[in-house]
Amino acid sequence: SPAWSGAQTFFNPALPESERLAAVLQREIRETLANTNRTPLKNESVYLLKALDMPSALVEVGFLSHPDESKLLADEDYQKKVAAALYRGILRYASGETGKR
C-alpha cells in the first residue's frame, strides 16, 4: 500500500538479546535515514526469527509499494546509506549499546 513507508525492524520476544539488536538497528536507521519514526516490533510468526537460537532481527528497509520510497530503494547512494546504518547498528550492538538514548 502506498500509505506505508519507512524501515521497520522485527524481533522474536523469546530472546531478549534480539530485542536489543532490533532496537539498536532501528535507532541507527532512524538517525541515518531520517525518514521514519518507527520502533522495533515483536514478531512471533516469522519462521527464521522463531527458529534461530541466537540474537536476530528482520529489517524491512522500505516499501516498494510507496512511490517515493520505491525510487529511493532503487538509488545506489540510498542503498549505501541503508547498508552503512545497518553496519553501524551491528557495531553498536556488538559494543553493548542498548538502542536507547
Question: Where are the regions that the model predicts?
Answer:
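Active-site-proximal helix/loop segments of hydrolytic enzymes
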Residues: S1-R101
